[in-house]
Amino acid sequence: MNCTEEFIAKMKQKDIVINFVQAWRNDTLEESYARLDKPTRLHAYSVSKSVTSIGVGLAVQEGLLRLDDPVLRFYPEYDPAELAPNLRRMTVRDLLMMGCGSKDKMFFWNDAQRLQCRAWQDYFLRNEFPYEPGTRFEYNNFNSYMCSCIVERAAGCRSEEHTSELQSLTNLV
């Protein structure tokens, strides 16, 4: 039995469902397990938030951005005068703290609009922000998504490339 099979067996004993696992060593895929076929779409909300937050921390450590940077610093192509006043005050920290000031979760749950919209950053930036950023907690997947986009813009590469050193983490179970 290989390590992945052992891991899956342990999780089954604990009634934990695992959909997908990969074991990488030195940029080589050593083992893989997939309970579902490739076209199946899954939501990975919480884990992606954690990895994205680490990516922001790495970018801060590298001097690519600061937590108090305004979100619009990374979107110079937008005219602030055409956007919601509270968006102009929103910082990276506000996004990390789930405090962007949105009126609701926007559309990042299960409605059809999510599948129809292709320009998610533009949708976010042109949305309403009736609340002052940082004053109201709203569990909103867009906060983490925008953090990931900001890391990409600051680092000049895809966020998963920027956080590639995380692939070396071992002994997670």
Give the location of each predicted region.
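Solvent-exposed loop and edge beta-strand segments that line ligand/cofactor-binding
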Residues: 44, 83-86, 132-139
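Active-site helix/loop module of the DD-peptidase/beta-lactamase fold
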Residues: 62-100, 126, 155-164, 168
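Short linear capping/connector segments at secondary-structure termini
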Residues: 34-38, 70-79, 109-111
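A short, well-structured edge-of-sheet supersecondary motif
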Residues: 3-37
